Regions:
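Catalytic cores of nucleotide-sugar-dependent glycosyltransferases that transfer UDP/GDP/TDP-activated
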Residues: 1-491
Length: 491
């Protein structure tokens, strides 16, 4: 099968969030399963220094907002990506400082709607083999609002590739004024709320993808159900319920990059291990090296007392307020230590830093993000804390399972789909992989942490729990096979 994967970011070329991680791994997994794949993304200024073997393939003109834009399409390759990359080069839209969506002052680029609408038009031309590339896909997979117009534009063609639109985060709807809709000369039949892309007198590029793709996917089965409820749908529950009822909204779990996140080979840790070899000793050694980062006394570093780690954004969505509520009591009532790595709301940063000053041998804080430290925490902590209020898929709990660090998670989205709660029944059945609480409250979080710390003292049970998690398959190959089964059903 020939697959065109359209995205606004891809690791390691350009990254602002989880979409880049998916784009950097999933298309490669299709390729390794013997499919012909091309990835297309905008040629941002920062991308040029990360690609090699650049060759111009074609030129074309795209009309939008009363002007004609000259477009060059380049082929390129990049370390870490195995498939051909097609860069859509429109200097006046994409050669800018800042990140793909924000100017240097942190505000959205004023013309983001035009930028990504034009990019989507180019993708549609490529898909229809009208871009001078002499290649036409059987299927186009587009991602989030930035490429939401691609499936819509392709519905205007009598014979076309099939389309799959993947939602990574419903929070970003790609809302733009009616004047952009008019400037793009889109069909007026689309300017209505039920089957079109109008949303409270704006156009929504996210809604365009949801309405008009042949199939809609999102990044976990539970999130696919959750986004049909108002609290997760941001006003789009009507169209999402319809797509779900049609059988056209499907959740497929993300995978993890096992070249980057693998305790057998991780370059950021000194003591490697696997589910069956060296796990107990290596985890203890990695724990000591992790604690040594904070220059703690030797007696604290050498202690077997449990360490609970957290790596993530310090924002309400991630449940950090719940963590702050329960930490003082847990410090008083248990022997656990807590390591927090992240950045976010200044108030959360302040309160966590205050706790670290108050309990310097029990609470260790790193404000910021460090790739090296994130790996060390996954390998060195005994438990990983992820109390997110909502989480479309989540990656850190998958890393934790892979590293034998049982996660404590709130039952939402991908967290529900990936962590098997350590109930009596699941422990007896040998299925448990972590700890789940079902109400995002301080009481539920605290009691779950206490349950986890109790099980930590039962070494045989704990080692079985670790091993169960490490034996789960969260590879991109597994994810890709599920996507490909969907693709084959509609092509």
């Amino acid at each position: 099968m020939k697959i065109l994967f359209a995205t606004s970011e891809a690791h390691p070329l350009i990254k602002t969030g989880g979409l880049a991680d998916v784009s950097g791994s999933l298309p490669d997994a299709y390729y390794h399963l013997k499919h012909k794949v091309r990835m297309v993304l905008p040629a941002y200024g920062d991308v040029w220094e990360k690609v090699s073997d650049v060759k111009q393939l074609s030129e074309l003109s795209i009309g939008a907002c009363g002007r004609k834009l000259h477009v060059r399409i380049h082929a390129a390759s990049a370390e870490g990506i195995d498939i051909p990359i097609w860069l859509v080069d429109i200097p006046e839209l994409f050669h800018r400082p800042g990140n793909p969506y924000l100017a240097l002052d942190g505000k959205d680029w004023w013309d983001n709607g035009e930028r990504f609408a034009v990019f989507s038009k180019v993708v549609a031309e490529i898909a229809m083999n009208r871009a001078g590339l002499k290649w036409q896909p059987d299927l186009v997979q587009s991602n989030d609002w930035q490429t939401g117009l691609v499936p819509a534009l392709l519905t205007l063609e009598s014979v076309r590739p099939k389309t799959v639109f993947t939602i990574h985060n419903m929070a970003y709807a790609g809302l733009f004024p009616k004047s952009l809709f008019e400037g793009l000369e889109l069909p007026w039949k689309w300017w209505e709320p039920d089957r079109g892309i109008e949303f409270y007198n704006n156009m929504s590029m996210l809604k365009a993808g949801i309405q008009m793709a042949d199939r809609v996917t999102t990044v976990s089965p539970s999130y696919a159900k959750e986004i049909t409820f108002p609290e997760y749908a941001y006003g789009l529950e009507g169209v999402l319920i319809r797509r779900l009822d049609e059988g056209h909204l499907i959740g497929i779990l993300n995978g993890i990059d096992q070249d980057l996140w693998n305790p057998k080979t991780d370059p950021f840790i000194d003591h490697h291990y696997s589910a069956d070899k060296g796990r107990v000793v290596a985890k203890k050694r990695n724990k000591k090296e992790m604690l040594d980062f904070w220059d703690l006394p030797k007696s604290v570093i050498d202690s077997d007392d449990p360490v609970v780690g957290l790596v993530g954004r310090l924002v309400p969505q991630k449940g950090i307020d719940l963590v702050l509520d329960v930490l003082p009591e847990l410090i008083e009532q248990t022997n656990a230590r807590f390591i927090m790595v992240g950045t976010g709301d200044s108030l959360f940063e302040y309160h966590l830093t205050e706790l670290a000053h108050q309990y310097p041998q029990r609470v260790m804080i790193y404000i910021g993000y460090s790739e090296s430290l994130a790996h060390k925490v996954e390998a060195g902590a005994d438990l990983f804390l992820m109390p997110s209020r909502f989480e479309p898929c989540g990656l850190n709990q998958l890393y934790s399972l892979a590293y034998g660090t049982p996660p404590i998670v709130h039952s939402t989205g991908g967290l529900s789909d990936t962590v098997v709660n350590a109930t009596k029944e699941n422990l007896v059945a040998g299925k448990a992989t972590g700890f789940v609480f079902y109400d995002p409250s301080r009481h539920a979080l605290k009691s779950t942490i206490l349950h986890a710390l109790h099980l930590f003292s039962k070494k045989r049970t704990w080692q079985k729990l670790q091993k169960n998690g490490m034996q789960q398959d969260f590879s991109w190959t597994r994810s890709a096979k599920q996507y490909l089964a969907l693709f084959k059903a509609i092509v």
